[in-house]
Amino acid sequence: MRYFRLCIISLLATLPLRVHAGPQPLEQIKLSESQLSGSVGMIEMDLARPGTLTAWRADERFPMMSTFKVVLCGAGLARVDAGDEQLERKIHYRRQDLVDYSPVSEKHLADGMTVGELCAAAITMSDNSAANLLLPAVGGPAGLTAFLRQIGDNVTRLDRWETELNEALPGDARDTTTARSMAATLRKLLTSQRLSARSQRQLLQWMVDDRVAGRLIRSVLPAGWFIADKTGAGERGARGIVALLGPNNKAERIVVIYLRDTPASMAERNQQIAGIAGALIEHWQR
């Protein structure tokens, strides 16, 4: 008997220790909704294959906020592929064309910016005027919505310009998407023949170069992991992020997280999104 017990003890000693595993992703989302007193819409999808890995309120509408800028630049790149646009085309504008939060475009009133530079500013710095300057080429909000319909997204819609599109009124369908629709659209833009391989690489690189997302998913990303993302922020507690991430510096999954109708501060919203992402990553690694 003593020998048997020693064998069991020796066997247990060789097993890996389970260290205080965090909550499962859906448990974390429920906790976040409780702490935020608001709603979370979320989906996790494989980038290469159809199917949903994790979802919560994935078919409910949430304000898009600045996450629409990825789709906007995707539509612009589709025009480049078709020969109707050039990333090198210079756009000139006046001070009265600027809206709130234009950290890049406000510095180029004298010389203007190219389409490529405006997309970089819109995605990497979330420059609002850059987005507005790009919208006319795709037909404005209605034209961008038409582009979405053409690529099979029958849900996502843009109705207004920056900065009015961030109003996020409860129950207002304007300027909204669902986590599922946004994730599917991202997959189409980055993996299907909707864009050329060159344009796909460019769109992804702009997202890799995002400089205003450090307090969200990037704050919990393990060393050596890949991430490309775009954030959004709006009124009435609206906050969101669309991202591609994966281990070994490879994009493997799409993660979309939206918040709405919460009195939480921006710091609290960022923390909750980071917490949800952290739970997803931990579950992924198990």
Curated annotation (Swiss-Prot):
It catalyses: a beta-lactam + H2O = a substituted beta-amino acid. Pfam families: Beta-lactamase2. The active site is at 66 (acyl-ester intermediate), 164 (proton acceptor). Substrate binds at residues 230-232. The keyword Mitochondrion does not apply. Residues 1-21 form the signal peptide. Its EC number is 3.5.2.6. It is an enzyme of class 3 (hydrolase). SUPFAM superfamilies: beta-lactamase/transpeptidase-like (SSF56601). Disulfide bonds join 73-119. GO terms for biological process: beta-lactam antibiotic catabolic process; response to antibiotic. Gene3D superfamilies: DD-peptidase/beta-lactamase superfamily. This is Beta-lactamase Ohio-1. It comes from Enterobacter cloacae.
